[in-house]
Amino acid sequence: MINLLNITYPEFESLIVTTLQEKTYRAMQIWQWVWQKQITDIESMTNLPQKIRASLTALIKINLPEIVTIQQSSDGTKKFLLRLSDGALIETVLIPSIDKAGNIRITQCLSSQVGCSMGCTFCSTATMGFIRNLTAGEIVSQVLLAKLHLNDNKPDKPIIRNIVFMGMGEPLLNLTELTRALHILHSEKGLNFSARRITVSTCGIKKGIQALSENGLAFLALSLHASNQELRSTIMPKAAKWDLKELIDTLKNYSLKKREKITFEYLLLGGINDSPEHAKELAKLITDIKGKLNLIPYNPAQGQPYLKPTEENILKFQKVLWSKGIVTILRKSKGQDINAACGQLKTTYLSQSSSTIY
């Protein structure tokens, strides 16, 4: 059987027309039942004749992960621990904000891998090691589950407004499945996320950056975290195999849409990369790129050797960047009290469980 969540709309339409010998509008009806109304029970798709429902039941399945736990932070952030069909565990996070009209808007942080191979020394996920890539269906199912949880079924007034690939894993090391997932997210007949509402964050995988530049399916964020190659080699040893200056040159040739900017992410580690000298070096590195910089104070995590920077050092760092003409945003981390903030995603459930899933 075919997992409907794992295929794009053109593939699904072809399946309905060629295999079931039905009209294309039937494909659209089914697709909208799943992706807009979050109906995953085929028998509940009431505008389909019984014959089609029976044929569809024999042809496709809709595999959703199991929700193991949901934790809610004092700031409203929610972290979902999900169990996939093979028992693997991943996390996805819902981050709330309030728009100008006073409505709640959610940014969802998605995982792209089980674990991560990059080994960044400040990241809790890195301690899991790399287990496997997620399929496109496993990526987009995180969104479907979140929409079900939120009762987010009004396409003209969505609650989940933005998607960020900043969860577990390096998205651009899972480029094939990531690209398929982006096409599913984009489908105007379904979730209808435009490129400007999706951000893919990477440690700096050049091949993947070039692919994202060509396909234009999402905005780009670069996890920089260091102002020079030597420092990056220390705190991001595997990512540092891509020379920093070559990486910046790649970004200078990145194809940007109108009003699009590259986002640079810089995690401030107390006493490591947070001096005014680092700020000057950083400004020089990125000054020729159309972008903006997110400053992220480090969130202390169990077992990690780093400290949170002082408020004084944070402000000094930001002041230097502003003086050099770098648009700099001090990002407030949410979900710290449930280990859902930047760098804290890790399936701690494993260590709390007496059973082993592998």
Curated annotation (Swiss-Prot):
Further details from the record: Reaction proceeds by a ping-pong mechanism involving intermediate methylation of a conserved cysteine residue.
Binding site for [4Fe-4S] cluster: 116, 120, 123
Cross-referenced SUPFAM superfamilies: Radical SAM enzymes (SSF102114)
Active site: 91 (proton acceptor), 342 (s-methylcysteine intermediate)
Family: Belongs to the radical SAM superfamily. RlmN family.
Descriptive protein name: Dual-specificity RNA methyltransferase RlmN
Places the protein is found: Cytoplasm
Listed EC numbers: 2.1.1.192
A single MF term (Gene Ontology): rRNA (adenine(2503)-C2-)-methyltransferase activity
InterPro entries for this protein: Aldolase_TIM, Methyltransferase_A, RlmN_N, RNA_MTrfase_RlmN, rRNA_lsu_MTrfase_RlmN/Cfr, rSAM
Residues bound to S-adenosyl-L-methionine: 169-170, 201, 223-225, 299
Cofactor(s) annotated in UniProt: [4Fe-4S] cluster
Top-level enzyme category: transferase
